[in-house]
Amino acid sequence: MAILLAFGLVAIYSSTVHQSGTSYVTRQAVWIAVGMAAMVGASRIRTKTLEAFAPLIYAVAVLLLAIVLVAGTGPHGAKRWFNLGFMSLQPSELAKIATVLFLARYLSGRKEIGESIRSVLTVFAIVGLPAFLVLYEPDMGTALVIAFIAIPMLYAAGLDPLYLAFLVSPLLAVIAAGEIVAWIIFTAFLIAVMVLAKFRTSLVALIFGVNFLVGSLAPRIWMGLEPYQRERIQAFLNPEAYSHGAGFQTIQAKIAVGSGGLIGKGLLQGTQKALGLVPEQHTDFIFSVIGEEMGFLASAAVLAVLAYVILKLFDVAKQARDRFTTYICFGFASMVLIQTVVNVGMNLGMTPVTGLTLPFLSYGGSSVIMLLGSMGIILSAYSTRKGY
């Protein structure tokens, strides 16, 4: 983690020094120090204590998400942060941790999920409430992270992979709903798989009903997105058509990464960065700064270290002494994995621009403090893996 944090500070300095001097990198260094303190503090909290307070933490996070919609601030009319003067507090970062803790507590109290419709619906409610509030800010990227965290946690809880596939089928329903032939094929395939798998009639009805409802509402869902969100999705599908609009940042980020070559142009020498062609260089597109100025080798090294950290987090989950600890480790590891894949993907034009930051590297006080705090919880889990 120290290597990633150091890389992040260097990239933040390089991407902001010409416009703002050392103010950004100084603030990030302070937030990292606070995050380290949070990590040490969290590592001393027993997981049993976290399990007991998980409902309260979740309730506080949901309450803050509701309040920020009324009293929050943010760019372009969004309401994502509380302005505290010396920093901006982003409740959605706490919501990610709170959702993992509360969902882990719920799953650990169930012997098995199996085909229990009630259990699956409860999981949907646990992740759906904070995800909906975050989406309303609007912050589609973080909302998707909160929602998708449930998938690996349910897998760890023993839910059949086939059932997990059906949990994400509504997303396919939204896509298929745009064309009648695709919708017919999707519906027929969905029903055929459920019949061949010998699902209970009630479960077949539930899955079909949810997909039919979501598919029917697809036009409303699309129009319910903010204009810039629709443009980002359209730009992802056809970036050249939006080269002077929503697709501009993706195209410029790809150019920056590709122009770095093997060893990069050198620190502070990035032309795409210096000309301001890549927006949000110190947050969403910090990977493009690393690619342009430090090259492929440094980019590959960053990804390798991130992969190592993620694998170690999953390894801690396997060594955990109880189910609750296993689930929280799976949840936090998945959180880092999802954000890494999406952020790097949007820097390479492989995923839509969602505003998700790159874990450990991007600028952001709330994100780095909460992230390091979650790592402290995993350290607590690791220290008690043998029951002491």
Model-assigned labels for residue ranges:
Residues A2-S14, H18-G245, G291-L348, G373-I377:
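Hydrophobic alpha-helical transmembrane segments of multi-pass inner membrane proteins, especially
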Residues V17, M87-L89, L94, L267-L268, ...:
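Short capping/connector residues at structural and topological boundaries
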Residues E112-I113, T250-G258, I369-I378:
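Hydrophobic alpha-helical transmembrane segments
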Residues D139-L144, K265-G270, Q281-T283, L348, ...:
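Transmembrane helix boundary and interhelical junction motifs in multipass membrane proteins
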Residues A235-T283, M294-A298:
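TM-adjacent membrane-interface loops and short helices in multi-pass inner/ER membrane proteins
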Residues S288, S299, F330-G331, P359, ...:
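Pore-lining and gate-forming transmembrane alpha-helices of multi-pass membrane transport proteins
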Residues N343-Y388:
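A juxtamembrane structural motif centered on a specific transmembrane helix
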